[in-house]
């Protein structure tokens, strides 16, 4: 999964950053999906695609305007492709990933001036005591790609410790 998470609000996001976010988070997955679908159809085979999206596709924090919009576009593309390709038995689903402990997140935290121990401070504040790790998501991705999920397409699964719309 590729992704770009650079920060910017509605007022201060330069057009160049907006374009870069959409190039990485929406255009690149579109081009990859296009080639996969063409290849599967040419071979006459069914298949499955899983897009790694983000919880921010639901709206996101104010400092993630371009990121949230680009991942929202990927969420829409995921649903559109799922509908368009179901007759060819090509399934397309997405994972809306919550706050995760990844090298990219560490780089963003450092760039934003977070102290070196930011993770040890942030983890205990999470409902389950840590950030999501890639190994947590791997099982879901494997399931979505497997025959066990052969009747599932167009799903956007929220993989997070928080529940959208639940307060208190």
Model-based region annotation:
Residues 11, 59-65, 87, 129, ...:
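Active-site loop immediately N-terminal to the catalytic Tyr-X3-Lys motif
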Residues 86, 91, 152-154:
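Short, small/polar-rich loop/turn modules that mediate ligand/substrate recognition or access, typified
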Residues 54:
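Residue(s) in the substrate-gating loop at a strand-loop-helix junction
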Residues 33, 70:
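Active-site helix of classical SDR
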Residues 9-10, 17-19, 122:
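Substrate-binding pocket helix/loop in short-chain dehydrogenase/reductase
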Residues 59, 142, 153-168:
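Short C-terminal tail/terminal secondary-structure segment
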Residues 38, 83-84, 150:
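Alpha-helical segment proximal to the catalytic Tyr-Lys
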């Amino acid at each position: 999964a590729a992704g770009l998470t650079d920060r910017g609000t509605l007022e201060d996001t330069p057009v160049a950053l907006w374009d870069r976010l959409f190039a990485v988070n929406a255009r690149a997955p579109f081009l990859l999906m296009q080639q996969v679908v063409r290849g599967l159809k040419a071979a006459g085979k069914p298949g499955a695609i899983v897009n790694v999206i983000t919880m921010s596709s639901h709206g996101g924090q104010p400092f993630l305007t371009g990121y949230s919009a680009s991942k929202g576009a990927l969420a829409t593309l995921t649903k559109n492709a799922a509908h368009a390709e179901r007759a060819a038995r090509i399934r397309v689903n997405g994972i809306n990933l919550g706050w995760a402990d990844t090298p990219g997140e560490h780089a963003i935290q450092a760039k934003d001036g977070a102290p070196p121990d930011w993770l040890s401070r942030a983890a205990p504040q999470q409902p389950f005591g840590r950030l999501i790790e890639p190994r947590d998501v791997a099982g879901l991705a494997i399931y979505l790609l497997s025959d066990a999920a052969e009747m599932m397409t167009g799903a956007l699964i929220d993989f997070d410790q928080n529940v959208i719309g639940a307060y208190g």
